């Protein structure tokens, strides 16, 4: 199976090739086709299996096929940690390199002004941690009325229990 057979468009195929992707992983092969049609997908897989690509590439394709000139927020990816938010933001930048969509990442622990400025320029995709999302939403900098896609990202942290 190839990424082309999954139904991804040429700009995304080119970006995946730029990143060294040759063929889809099992989670990508199962998740991408239904996600491209707008169906809800719940995916679970180990670290390093390509989960981010499995949800990011269909989001990028769906939004690029129905572009809006004003870059309204249409996809929200909610992640528990700053580190994961940054990683997912980097993936959106890489997979969307040949598209005209805008994304930004917001998280706490840093000044909010650069994040507010990025939101003010308009974004199609927002990757956020819950605390900063709520802060900027309550201040009126994040508007959700045009939201089409919501992806809650979580991870499982395993730790040994003392006996």
Descriptions of predicted regions:
Residues 2-42:
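Conserved pre-motif I regulatory segment
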Residues 6, 15, 19, 34-35, ...:
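Amphipathic alpha-helical segments that mediate coupling or scaffolding at interfaces
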Residues 30-97:
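Conserved P-loop/Walker A NTP-binding site and adjacent catalytic elements of P-loop NTPases
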Residues 71-135:
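Conserved nucleic-acid-binding Ia/Ib motif block in the N-terminal RecA-like helicase ATPase lobe
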Residues 127, 151-152:
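Walker B beta-strand of ABC/ABC-like P-loop ATPase nucleotide-binding domains
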Residues 130, 154-155:
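Walker B catalytic acidic pair
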Residues 139-148:
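Short basic/glycine-enriched coil/helix segment immediately N-terminal to the Walker B
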Residues 156-163:
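Conserved small/polar residues in nucleotide/adenosyl-binding loops
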């Amino acid at each position: 199976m190839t990424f082309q057979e999954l139904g991804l468009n040429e700009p995304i195929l080119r970006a995946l090739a730029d990143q060294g992707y040759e063929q889809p992983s099992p989670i990508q092969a199962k998740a991408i086709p239904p996600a491209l049609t707008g169906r809800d997908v719940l995916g679970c897989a180990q670290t390093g299996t390509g989960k981010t690509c499995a949800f990011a590439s269909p989001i990028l394709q769906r939004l690029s096929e129905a572009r809006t000139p004003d870059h309204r927020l249409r996809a929200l990816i909610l992640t528990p940690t700053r580190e994961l938010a940054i990683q997912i933001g980097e993936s959106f930048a890489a997979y969307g390199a040949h598209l005209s969509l805008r994304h930004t990442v917001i998280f706490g622990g840093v000044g909010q002004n650069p994040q507010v400025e990025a939101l003010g320029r308009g974004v199609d995709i927002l990757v956020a941690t819950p605390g900063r999302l709520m802060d900027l939403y309550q201040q009126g900098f994040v508007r959700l009325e045009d939201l089409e896609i919501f992806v809650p990202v979580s991870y499982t942290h395993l730790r040994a229990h003392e006996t």
